[in-house]
Amino acid sequence: MAAESFELIAELREFTGKSAARRMRRFEDKVPGTVYGAGKAPQSITLLQKDLLKALESESTFSSILTLKVGDKKQKVILKALQRHHTKPKIVHIDFQRIKASEKLIMNVPLHFLGEDDCPGVEAGGVVSHLQSEVEIRCLPADLPEYIEVDLSHLQLDESVHLSNLKLPAGVGLTSAVDEEHDSPIASVHMPRVSKADVEAEAAEAALAKEAATEAAEEEETEKPASEAEASGEAEQADTDKKE
């Protein structure tokens, strides 16, 4: 699936430097950024924090061709670097790279795992582990996929899917060489490991349940004679009343 195109609106940044960027973030709720590449001079820009945060809610923003409108001019870019605030849900700085239709670009694209809930390994009690969540690819802008699907529906217990198993779209290649010695696993299925703490907790829970059942049985036995005595007394009283 080809990546969608999103449009972001930015303004040229007149003042640069840490102090100017700090004031901009604090008083104007704007994010400083830079646009570079394609043989053109870098541009210092600003974007509204709220618009940028909304765009970043979509996973596609990170692996798509973006349209960046600066003033009255539009340019095709990709999101190249993002710096987040360490305690607040805010963006501190962002970098965009211009692209050319004739030049290949390098991007990290997310992996979407399919069929894992119904694979034989899971049905046998195994658990799927995602060892990689994205891969780095090289392709022309027109061939950039939004994500790459990984079919796990065939996985048996103790089996893995490797980079060499990926079905890449036409025109898309991995940046890393893949051979017998360099073929990283991206997902696997194994039986869940039970830790010592889990075993001890399960044993303690079973002991408590057994103790509770024993106490309930003892209480039942204690109440039973009293109930029988009451029933016997009622019967004797009934016989006495009958004779009278």
From Swiss-Prot:
The gene is rplY. Residues 204-215 have a biased composition (Low complexity). GO terms for molecular function: 5S rRNA binding; structural constituent of ribosome. InterPro entries: Rbsml_bL25/Gln-tRNA_synth_N (IPR020056), Ribosomal_bL25/Gln-tRNA_synth (IPR011035), Ribosomal_bL25_b-dom (IPR020057), Ribosomal_bL25_C (IPR037121), Ribosomal_bL25_long (IPR001021), Ribosomal_L25_dom (IPR029751), Ribosomal_uL5_bac-type (IPR020930). Belongs to the bacterial ribosomal protein bL25 family. CTC subfamily. Part of the 50S ribosomal subunit; part of the 5S rRNA/L5/L18/L25 subcomplex. Contacts the 5S rRNA. Binds to the 5S rRNA independently of L5 and L18. It comes from Coxiella burnetii (strain RSA 493 / Nine Mile phase I). Signal peptide: none annotated. Keywords: Ribonucleoprotein, Ribosomal protein, RNA-binding, rRNA-binding. This is one of the proteins that binds to the 5S RNA in the ribosome where it forms part of the central protuberance. Residues 197-244 are annotated as: Disordered. NCBIfam families: bL25_bact_ctc, PRK05618.1-2, PRK05618.1-5, PRK05943.1. This is Large ribosomal subunit protein bL25. SUPFAM superfamilies: Ribosomal protein L25-like. HAMAP family: Ribosomal_bL25_CTC. One of its GO terms (cellular component) is cytosolic large ribosomal subunit. The lineage of its organism: Bacteria, Pseudomonadati, Pseudomonadota, Gammaproteobacteria, Legionellales. GO terms for biological process: translation. Gene3D superfamilies: Ribosomal protein L25, beta domain (2.170.120.20), Ribosomal Protein L25, Chain P (2.40.240.10).
